[in-house]
Each structure stands twice: as C-alpha cells, then as structure tokens.
C-alpha cells in the first residue's frame, strides 16, 4: 500500500501545482494586465500585489511540485486560495464566479491536507529528511 500512497501524493502535488505554476507564469509575463485586474478589485499598491502573486503562485506552485517546504507552502497556498476567493469570486449571481469560489475552497482543502500530512516519500522534503539535511 505504501507505493500507492506515494504515487497518490506525487500525482496530487503535480495536479495541485499546475494551476499555480500556470497562473504565476502568466502573471510574470503580463504585469500590466495583472496590475489592472488587481486595480479592478480596488486593491492598493498593485505593483506589490503583482510581485506577491507571482512569488506565491509561481514559487508556491513549484515548491509544491517538488515537495519543497511542503507543509509551510501548503498552508500559505491554502490562505491564498481563501483570500483570492473572497477578493475576486464573491459575485454569486454569476454562476462562473460561484464555480471559481467553490474551486478555490476545494483547493484550500487540498492544501490544508498537504500542510497536515506533507508531500509524501517522493518529495525533496522527504529526501532531505532521509539524508539528515537541515533546511535551516
């Protein structure tokens, strides 16, 4: 059963990371469009918001993919999913926004699971732990 759990953890990390890597990469390549979207939500300091979004989404997505600092990054991405749902997807009269809100809540649950249980045996975290490498 251990092989099944390891495979599921790896496939889960891959699936969960794709949305964030894709979104973060898009934001990195289109800063003006991202900043305009943030301004449309009446957020202050959109230049910093753009940088934060790129770091959290692209950096966090890559970290989850690799299983690096998985528990901490999982918690950060769970909070990010709730924040972006509350900021950008609360127009429940629009069915599309309702679906995006629920998608964010589902991702929140997945990231909380990652935060609780880690990235599995096939992660950089586990590899470093096996080798006794300190990540401080």
Predicted regions and their residues:
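Extended, low-polarity transmembrane helix blocks
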Residues: 1-29, 47-55, 59, 65-136
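Membrane-interface interhelical connector segments
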Residues: 29-44
């Amino acid at each position: 059963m251990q092989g099944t759990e390891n495979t599921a953890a790896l496939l889960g990390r891959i699936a969960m990371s794709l949305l964030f890597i894709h979104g973060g990469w898009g934001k990195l390549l289109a800063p003006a469009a991202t900043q305009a979207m943030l301004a449309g939500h009446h957020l202050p300091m959109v230049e910093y918001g753009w940088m934060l979004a790129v770091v959290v989404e692209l950096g966090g997505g890559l970290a989850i993919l690799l299983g690096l600092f998985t528990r901490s990054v999982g918690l950060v991405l769970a909070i990010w999913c709730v924040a972006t749902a509350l900021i950008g997807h609360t127009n429940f009269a629009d069915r599309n926004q309702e679906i995006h809100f629920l998608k964010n809540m589902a991702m929140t649950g997945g990231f909380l699971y990652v935060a609780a249980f880690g990235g599995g045996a096939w992660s950089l975290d586990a590899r470093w732990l096996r080798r006794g490498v300190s990540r401080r």
